[in-house]
């Protein structure tokens, strides 16, 4: 029951590219993003930061660093266009430069998570934030 409540809280106020990110993750990994990665390790999910626990968590760390480089839009809220062609993510060419960057960040993390499915460890699925050690800066 606690897990369902946490997932409901994560979904409240979700908009824009966050929904697109979750869709990309599902397309690449076959895993429901909020359920499997919403509180994974120290870096997956909103407001989480710390030394990565494994390669899966490292994907999220790199994604946060990618978002930090984006200027001119809100990576978590502003929508962009992309398509799924021949089992590949294709960011829309008509996206403004900022949203093109956001799409590429999201595409990279989705692919990284797929490439590291073998490192996914259920013990990190709902990992307590206090157990995370300070991470290096991006």
Curated annotation (Swiss-Prot):
Keyword NAD recorded: no
InterPro entries assigned to the protein according to its UniProt record, in alphabetical order: PLipase_A2 (IPR001211), PLipase_A2_Asp_AS (IPR033112), PLipase_A2_dom (IPR016090), PLipase_A2_dom_sf (IPR036444), PLipase_A2_His_AS (IPR033113)
Disulfide pattern: 42-132, 44-60, 59-112, 65-138, 66-105, 73-98, 91-103
Essential cofactor(s): Ca(2+)
Residues annotated to bind Ca(2+): 45, 47
Gene Ontology BP annotations: arachidonate secretion; lipid catabolic process; negative regulation of T cell proliferation; phospholipid metabolic process
Superkingdom of the organism of origin: Eukaryota
Subcellular location: Secreted
Signal peptide region: 1-16
Tissue specificity field: Expressed by the venom gland.
Keywords for this protein: Blood coagulation cascade inhibiting toxin, Disulfide bond, Hemostasis impairing toxin, Hydrolase, Metal-binding, Myotoxin, Secreted, Signal, Toxin
GO CC annotation: extracellular region
Active-site residues, Swiss-Prot/TrEMBL: 63, 106
Reaction(s) the record says it catalyses: a 1,2-diacyl-sn-glycero-3-phosphocholine + H2O = a 1-acyl-sn-glycero-3-phosphocholine + a fatty acid + H(+)
EC number(s) stated in the UniProt entry for this protein: 3.1.1.4
Reported function: Snake venom phospholipase A2 (PLA2) that shows anticoagulant activities, strong myolytic activity, infiltration of polymorphonuclear cells, and edema in stromal tissues. Induces cell death of Jurkat cells in a concentration-dependent manner. Shows a low phospholipase A2 activity. PLA2 catalyzes the calcium-dependent hydrolysis of the 2-acyl groups in 3-sn-phosphoglycerides.
Anything else known: Is abundantly expressed in Tokunoshima and Amami-Oshima P.flavoviridis venom, but is missing in Okinawa P.flavoviridis venom. It is thought that loss of BP-II in Okinawa P.flavoviridis is due to lack of necessity for a strong toxicity exerted by BP-II in the venom as far as they feed mostly on frogs.
Similarity section: Belongs to the phospholipase A2 family. Group II subfamily. K49 sub-subfamily.
Subunit (UniProt): Exists as a monomer in both solution and crystal states. In the presence of SDS or probably in the presence of phospholipids, assembles to form SDS-resistant stable oligomers.
Name this polypeptide is given: Basic phospholipase A2 BP-II
Annotated source species: Protobothrops flavoviridis (Habu)
